[in-house]
Structures are given as structure tokens and as C-alpha cells.
Curated annotation (Swiss-Prot):
Represses a number of genes involved in the response to DNA damage (SOS response), including recA and lexA. In the presence of single-stranded DNA, RecA interacts with LexA causing an autocatalytic cleavage which disrupts the DNA-binding part of LexA, leading to derepression of the SOS regulon and eventually DNA repair. The keyword Manganese does not apply. One of its GO terms (molecular function) is DNA-binding transcription repressor activity. The gene is lexA. The keyword Oxidoreductase does not apply. Belongs to the peptidase S24 family. HAMAP family: LexA. GO terms for cellular component: protein-DNA complex. This is LexA repressor. The lineage of its organism: Bacteria, Pseudomonadati, Pseudomonadota, Alphaproteobacteria, Hyphomicrobiales.
Amino acid sequence: MLTRKQYELLRFISERLKESGVPPSFDEMKDALDLRSKSGIHRLITALEERGFIRRLPNRARAIEVIKLPELQAAAGNRRGFTPSVIEGNLGKVRASSSADEGERPVAVPVMGRIAAGTPIEALQTRSHTISVPPDMLGSGEHYALEVRGDSMVEAGILDGDMALIQRNESADTGDIVVALIDDEEATLKRFRRRGASIALEPANAAYEVRILPPNRVKIQGKLIGLYRKY
């Protein structure tokens, strides 16, 4: 499933190609989607190309070919009001209980929105509600939950619709599954690895590509410690 911005950009490119036979410039795309910078357009174009919706033609400036349009899928997504979001301040802090009875009480963990287990999405900052979590699922420190959207981590057992329980942390070890904030704009749930001087954000689905980024573009916002799933 495409995010709202990805779908809007795909439709804009397709309509421009039908009208004039020439794809829009990056400045025109930026203005059409009301984005602040062209870097956001570059990321959206890359995501659409990785998912097989467009193709960039080599040796030709601004040459983009639309391969397919996910009409039904995108329309369904828009009806649901898909608005991915992640992380704000005032995160729920888990404190040691003063008695055995208190230690058995469920802990209210704030749900901070949705996180992409797929192509990175724009990060908004909204707190929606809380969920009750058994205290033995949590360690010390601050915790929050994010609703997973996408299928890029299915081979790690993380499914679309799962609630990811996150321990707030600004660092990670190689192999940890983390909430990564990219360029202070996009957030994604991926496996973290160091590759020399770079950071690799790895999916757990062969349909998605590993993203290699310099450390100054990636901020760790927390580590996955468990999943909360309703049946």
C-alpha cells in the first residue's frame, strides 16, 4: 500500500505525462505536494521506483515512466484516513512498583501513532490513546507503542496492524529492530546495522531494499521490545 503522499505524487506525474508527455520538474512536484524541500520528492520518487510503480530512464533528464497505478488500493487507503505518525514528548515512564499487587497491575502505555514497516513515511507527532500492557513485558525506562503499517518486517514476525512496544533509546546495537527517524522527517521500523561508517536499515522482506545512510541522517528513537497483537 502506498502512503498518501506517494499516491498523490504518482497521480500528479501520471496526469502531467498524459497532458504534455513530459514529467513535471522536481520544483513542480514539491509545490504540488506542498513540501518544504526537494529532498522529500527525491525520497518519494525512490520509494515509488522501489515498489515498481515508476521507472527512471537512464541518460535522460527528468525522464520518468509510470508503470502502474494502484487505483483501488490507494482509494481504500484514503478512505481510512491513513496518517502515519511517530513519537512526541511526554512518553509513558514505567516505574518500579511499591508492592507485589502493584507489580501485577497492567501498565498504561501511550500509543504515539503509526509507524511504517515498509517505505519510510512522514513523521507526525500525535498521541492518540493508551493500551494496557502486562508489566513483565516491559523493562525499566520509558516506553510507548506504535501501530505497524506495512509488510516489510513480516519475516521478523511483525505484521501489519501489530502494536509495536518500543523502549525509548537514542542508541542501538547491530541487529536491534529500531524506530529510525530519517532527516527529522520520516520514520520507519527496521533492523539496525552498522556498515563501516554508514548505517544500514534492513527490512525483513525480500521485496524491499536495504537503505544505506550516513549517521547524521538517522536518529534512533527507540528499540523494539515486544509486540501486542489482537485476534
